[in-house]
Amino acid sequence: MTPPVDHDAIVVGAGPVGQFLAAELQRHGMETLLLEQRDGTAETRSRSGSAPNGRAIGLHPPALAALEACGATERILEEAARIERGAAYDRARRLATLDLSVLGARFPFAASIPQHTTERAISASGPAALRGARVTELAPEPGVVRVSVRTGVRTHERTARAVVIATGAAGRDLALPFTGFSLHEYPDRYLMSDAPAALDPRADDRTAIITLDRRGVLESFPLAGGGRRLVARITAHADGRPDRTAVDALRRAVAERAGSDALAAAIGSVSPFRIRRAIVHRMRLDPAGRLFVIGDAAHEVSPIGGQGMNLGLLDAAGLAPLLAARLRRDDDLDVALRAWEHDRLASARTAARLGSLNTALGRARSRAVHAMLSAGIPAAMRTPLRRTLARAYTMGFDRAAERSRPDQAGP
């Protein structure tokens, strides 16, 4: 007999992944409590300046398709910039252009939108989060998971038939009593700026630009509402000169690699960041299938490639109907849940490999190697590799995307 519980499900973490899972569970008829440690929403933190501008901005076609059912996609696309193509440059010389519509996907573009806007669009479909609620312990038992929650100075217990950790990487400790994980720290350092007034003279506002410079990569992405996100790999002493400030370093990198002083001058505040890869060994954390971990808490991949948040959204899209069916029938659904876990971990490893490849391609290189790379890219883009790259850079190799491809659909 199932013991009495407070909720069908508890989702820990009200970022975009946690909010989406809670919305989908609610859409499938599950009474769901959404807990968030932080007091404000991402939007209020962004306005106050307490949230870094190093937040995810890219939503790829599989994630846009997954968000459709709850109505979030329509709201997102009302405000997003649509990235329809990518272009590779060597300074001002265009090496190749990749049209994302070549795959014939439901959404032939990526959406560029601030993460707080994505969260707002998703939250309109789901339960309101209980904020300022920090989960300190999870205890799965037969038929129930006990959740210790601290609000202010008081700690109390909530119970649910299932609990999902969706805290982001900062809350991975909640999963560690139940699973190990592999971790790789990259040596690479980056500087990033969202510049609302920036115009990249090499392309229009629907084109993302990757500049392959021998000193390191420069990325230039359209922003919703205009402007550009600029990301450059840097060294501590670029060209033998110590960087005076992060702003100076990024402006210099943009001017040298893009060949545009005007683009460099548009840079204001700058955020430094480093990257790492972490993947848990298991996403289903207990044998009974009542405790799970998804999103960045489960798999953290290099943001060079922009797939991290999308991975988590696809985790949630696949888990929600299975978990709802399991709770509705009080049935283990062991085979289906194991298949979901296998697919999501495989997709995380694929995204991690792609991120590692992008990271390696973005590193400084000798003049000879750079010349070979610049000569090889135009030739490669005249081969079937063009479609393969389009799939790779729109998350087409994610297991969820592969199952929904038009050429894989049944009659």
Regions found by a protein language model. Give the residues of each.
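C-terminal helical "tail/cap" subdomain of flavin- and related membrane-associated enzymes
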Residues: 322-411
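Beta1/beta-strand and adjacent pyrophosphate-binding region of the FAD-binding site
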Residues: 2-17
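A conserved short coil-to-beta-strand element within the FAD-binding core of flavoproteins
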Residues: 131-145
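Conserved mid-domain beta->alpha element of the FAD-binding
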Residues: 13-27, 122, 267, 273-357
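Conserved FAD-binding catalytic core of PHBH/FMO-like flavoproteins
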Residues: 162-275
